[in-house]
Structures are given as structure tokens and as C-alpha cells.
Amino acid sequence: MKTSDAFWQFLPEGLNELFEMVRFEKTDQSYDIWLDEKKKLSDEDYRNPNIVARGYTDYVTVQDYPMRGRPVYLHMRKNKWWDKKTNEIFSYTLELPNEEGTRLSAEFVAFFKDEG
């Protein structure tokens, strides 16, 4: 198992299917992990030539469960998509692939449900 694969085992299950890790920082006080949503359109939008990537939302910081006595901060951002036809900019509501039994803080759930 690669180190990067092993690291995902300590984060909420299914997160690696939605995000890619872009930065990791360990300090004396905490672990900070930056995650960007993977660029993936819904099946419906994939067939729509008017939907194009429009960058990312601002990072939202969520405190996850501690590891080895240090708080873990996940700095996550979602993709922004632009519908050229309607001029609407949107983000998808995200759902973890295996939500049942996954323990998430209210802050974490709010990030996934926010359509930004």
C-alpha cells in the first residue's frame, strides 16, 4: 500500500472518491490537510456542452477527529461550474459513497450539503 493510500484510511470513509489531497502540513499543534474536489460532472451535465469548470469555491475548514493527540483540520473546496447558456455558477451537493455508519460532525455535513 502506498503512503498516500494509507493516509486516506484515517479520514472519513469515501472521502478519497470525491477529493484529491493537494497539501499536507504537520505542525506541533495540528495536522492540516487541503483537499480539492475531483473534477467530475454529473451524468446529465457531462452531455451538456454549456457546462464548463469555473475554478473552486473558497476553502472551508472543518475540524475532523483528532489523530495522535493533535486536532486535524480539513481545508476543503468544491468545484464551481458555469452554465454558459443560463450564466449560472453552481457547485454540486456532495454525498459520501458510504454514508451509513460514517460519523461526521455537523460542520462536515453542512459543507457537503452546501451548494455554494
Give the positions of each predicted feature.
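Short linear sequence motifs
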Residues: 3, 12, 24, 49-52, ...
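N-terminal juxtadomain amphipathic helix
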Residues: 34-82
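Amphipathic, alpha-helical segments enriched in basic
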Residues: 8-10, 20, 51, 58, ...
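Broad hydrophobic/π-residue packing in well-ordered secondary structure
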Residues: 11-13, 45, 83-86
